[in-house]
Amino acid sequence: MHPFGADPEETAMTLMPPRSWLFVPADSEKKIAKALDSEADAIIFDLEDSVTAERKDAARAILKALPPRDGGPRWWVRINPVGSEHLKADLKMLASADMFGIVLPKAEGVGDVTHIAHRTGNVPIHAIVTETAASLFCLSSYRDAKAPLVAMSWGAEDLSAALGASSKYDANGELSFTYQWARSMTLAGAVAAGVQPVDGVFADYKDEVGLEAEARAAARDGFTGKLAIHPAQIAIINAAFTPSAAEIAHAEAIIAAFGADPSAGVLSINGRMVDRPHLLQAQGVLARARE
């Protein structure tokens, strides 16, 4: 494996933070083939929740037997969590599999990230940071990471089970306060740590309208990618996290205006007042734009 973004064969597009992170059970060659044929920016081969204990050895063997990646999406593997009896075998497998990075589930603070980094030679790590009750008290710790943390995402399903909740939704069908808080703190924690904030999964892969609404809301809030559980979700997610032509044009106008008057604190663009925070937002839009 190589440091995040250091592979000389990576294209300009794949060097950008992935918009779509697609989970696929690592023990299903059929589902892996479908995932590899998708337009996902990142594929997460799952050795954790979607693979039973009896199938984990077979799943590792399948990953080791995959041919070397030849372009396309980055390959990641979701290992079993720190403290799991399966972790040692997962990490051993990584030495002979062509994976870009690790997705660490049930992370409970920067210590878990550092632990994995010390055992893998600083492989890029995407931490899922809200899956246990204890994890909710650790979301500010990641800003101190010396390890190669590159992304943080949140998970509601495992958290709901950990808390003993009967549902993560309120009477109006919206996420209840606990899960809204976990989502918001993941976003803030990732930005504070200087890593990619990734929104959680939308479980009903057949509900395209609901997925689009949730993905676009996540993009508005500041997330730059989203986890996916089915190839059918990828096109909608990619579109939601790709700036539109109008957004790009507006961002370019803001940057050009401040470029023409570098000392200005406030300017007028198309009859609207913009200031330095708008300039930062515009720069972020262009950073996410794809040809």
Model regions: which residues?
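Expand to "…catalyze enediolate/carbanion chemistry for C-C bond making/breaking, isomerization
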Residues: 2-291
